[in-house]
Amino acid sequence: MFYAHFVLSKRGPLAKIWLAAHWDKKLTKAHVFECNLESSVESIISPKVKMALRTSGHLLLGVVRIYHRKAKYLLADCNEAFIKIKMAFRPGVVDLPEDNREAAYNAITLPEEFHDFDQPLPDLDDIDVAQQFTLNQSRVEEITMREEVGNISLMTDNDFGDFGMDDREMMREENAFGDIIHESSAANLLLEAEPGPAHLPDKTPNLDYDDFGDNNLENSDGGILMDKILSNEDGGGIFDDPPAITDSVMMPQDHGDDDDDFDNFSPAGGPDSPDSGPVEPLPNTTDQTDQTEQTTLVPNEDEAFALEPIDITVKETKAKRKRKLIVDSLKELDSKTIRAQLSDYSDIVTTLDLAPPTKKLMMWKETGGVEKLFSLPAQPLWNGRLLKMFTRCLTPLVPDELRKRRKGGEADSLEDFLKELENPEVPREEVLGHRSDVIDQTIMEEPSMLQASSMEGSRTALDESMMPPPSRQRGLKRKSLETLEKDAVLPPMGVLEQTLQPLDQSVLSHQLEMPQVELPPEDTTNLSRLIPELDLLDEKSKDKDKDDSDEEGEEGQGGDQDQEERRWNKRTQQMLHGLQRVVAKTGAQSISLLELCRNNNKKQAAAKFYSFLVLKKQQAIDLTQTEPYSDIIAAPGPRFHIV
C-alpha cells in the first residue's frame, strides 16, 4: 500500500477515521470531539494520493462511526440537561411574583450575635489548685535517674562506649573557662609549688573541684581535673588515647578520707597533714610520655583485634534465565513442496461403494458373506445362549498330523492351517472314491468302481489341462463349487448317449491329442465308452467357462442386472436334474440332505445346501426341518417338473 503512511500516520488527517473503522474502542471521547468530519470527508473525496475503493470504503465507515459517536454524546448531554432543568422546575416549586422577586435582607443575612464576655470570674478559693497540682506530682525518686558514680579511672579508658553524658559536658558552654583553658597547661599545674600551711583549706568537705558547681572557678586558676580533660596541650585531651601507666611515673598517695577525688585522675592537691613540706620538682618525663603514648595496653596488636568471624548471610538472588530465541529454519516452502501438496488429492478421493438397489439385496449383502453364512443360523436367533450353542460346533479342529507338523516347524503359522481347513482344494479322486451317495446309487447301468475311477481320472486330467487360469480369486471359488456339484451329481447315461451325436469333430480331434491317462489293462475295453463322456465334459467345461466369463462381465458392468433375475446356474440345474432322476427311478418322495452330503467336506456340503435353498426359493422343492440343527428333508415342490 503506497498510501499506508498517508492513512495510518498518527498525525495524519485520516488517522482517527482509520482507527474508528478498525478499532472503535481505541477512540476516546476527547478524540471524537476533536475530530473534524468536514475536513475528513473532503480528504476522502479529494485525497492527496490515489486510494483504492476498498480503502475509501473503510474510511467512510470510520466517518459514520465517529458521527454516530458524536450524535450519541450529544444525545447524552441533552438528556442530562433536560433532567437538570426538570429537577430545577418541579411542579411543587411556586414561582415568585414580580414584586417579590428580591429576597428579604433578613432571609439571606446571618444575624450578628455579640456575646457578653464581661462575666465575673469565679473565686479562686472555689478551685483547689493545690489538689489539682498534687494529682500530677511525682516523687523525686520516680522521675530522677540514680547517679551511679564509681571509681572509674579515666586513665584506663579506651574511649569506647558513652562518655560526656553528665554535667561535666555542660560546663563546656560556661564562660568561666574562656581564659583558663587557653592559659593553663598540664605542665604548669604539675610543676606548681604546693601552698603553705597558712593557705591550706579546712577539713570540711569542699566542692571546689567536683565539677558540680562553678562558684569558685572565677578566682581560681582552674581545677586540675578540668584542665586535664579539656586541655589539648601535651596530648592530654579527652579525645586522645590515654597514656599507659608506667612505674617511672610518680603517683600521690591515696587518702581514704578524700571523698571528693573520686576519679583518682591526677596527683592534684596536697596532703592534708600540716607537716607536709614542699614537694621536689618532678623529673622531665617528656620522653617517657611520648614513649607511653605510642604503646598499647595489649602487647600483641593482632590478638587485640582477633575477633571471631561473623557469618555473612548472602542474599540469594534468583538467576535470570536467558530467553532462548527460537527461529524457524524453514521460513518458506519451495515450489516442489507446494506442487506436491497441490497434486496430492488422496484425502478428497474415496472408492465408490454403491448400495444395492433393493432391500433384499441389501440384506443378502450384509448376511451373504462367508463369515455370516458359517456363523449364523438360517433363522434369526435373538437369544444369545442359542447363538452360542450354534457357533460352538463351528470352530475348526486341527488334526493331530497338522499339530505335529506345527510343532516340527514344517508349517509357517496356525493361520495357514486354518485356511487349509476352511478352503481346502477339492480332491477329485477322494470325491469319486466315496460314491455311496443316494444319487449315485439310483443311477441305472452304472459302471463298476474301477471304470468310474478311470473315467474320473481322465476327466480330471482334461479339466486341469483345458481349464484356463482364473483371473480372480472370486472366480476360482465359483468354479470350484460348480465342479463340486458337477462331480457330485452325474447326468444319466441316456443323456450322455443323446449328447454324443451332435459333437463337433474339431472338439473330438482336439481331445484326442490330449495325453492319455494310464488305465489298468482290464479296462481297455471301456475306453470307447469314456470318449463320449470326455467330450461331454469338455463341452461342459467350455460352457462353464463361458458362463463364468458372462457372469464376470455382468459384474464388471456394475450390476445392471439383478442377481435375482439370474436364477438358474449350472449347479442348481444339475442338482434339480439329479433329484428328478432319483424320484423317477426310486419313487422316493423325500431326500435327506444329510445322506446327500455324507463323506463330503465343508465346501461341498455348503454348495449342496445353497442349491437346496435356491430350489426352495423357486418352489421346485419343499424343505422341512423338525428341530434346529436336525436333518433337512427335501420333497418335490409344485414346480418340480415344470422348471
From Swiss-Prot:
GO biological process, one term: embryonic viscerocranium morphogenesis
Keyword DNA damage applies: yes
Site feature: Cleavage: D275, S276
Superkingdom of this protein's organism: Eukaryota
Biased composition annotated in UniProt, kind: Acidic residues: 548-563
Keyword Cell inner membrane: no
Annotated GO MF terms: chromatin binding; sequence-specific DNA binding
Spans annotated as Disordered: 234-298, 447-479, 532-566
A cellular component annotation (GO) from this entry: spindle pole
Keyword field: Activator, Apoptosis, Cell cycle, Cell division, Centromere, Chromosome, Chromosome partition, Cytoplasm, Cytoskeleton, Developmental protein, DNA damage, DNA repair, Mitosis, Nucleus, Phosphoprotein, Repressor, Transcription, Transcription regulation
Modification note: Cleaved at the onset of anaphase; this cleavage is required for sister chromatid separation and cytokinesis. Cleaved by caspases at the beginning of apoptosis. May be phosphorylated; may become hyperphosphorylated in M phase of cell cycle. The large dissociation of cohesin from chromosome arms during prophase may be partly due to its phosphorylation by PLK1.
A Pfam family this chain is assigned to: Rad21_Rec8
Result of knocking out the encoding gene: Morpholino knockdown of the protein causes abnormal embryonic development. At 5 dpf, morphants exhibit delayed food transit along the gut and depletion of enteric neurons.
Biased composition (Basic and acidic residues): 537-547
UniProt feature, compositional bias: Low complexity: 266-278, 285-296
Assembly behavior: Component of the cohesin complex, which consists of an SMC1 and SMC3 heterodimer core and 2 non-Smc subunits RAD21 and STAG1/SA1, STAG2/SA2 or STAG3/SA3.
Family: Belongs to the rad21 family.
PANTHER family membership: DOUBLE-STRAND-BREAK REPAIR PROTEIN RAD21 HOMOLOG-RELATED (PTHR12585:SF71), SCC1 / RAD21 FAMILY MEMBER (PTHR12585)
Role: Double-strand-break repair protein rad21 homolog: As a member of the cohesin complex, involved in sister chromatid cohesion from the time of DNA replication in S phase to their segregation in mitosis, a function that is essential for proper chromosome segregation, post-replicative DNA repair, and the prevention of inappropriate recombination between repetitive regions. The cohesin complex may also play a role in spindle pole assembly during mitosis. In interphase, cohesins may function in the control of gene expression by binding to numerous sites within the genome.
Designated name of the protein: Double-strand-break repair protein rad21 homolog A
Organism: Danio rerio
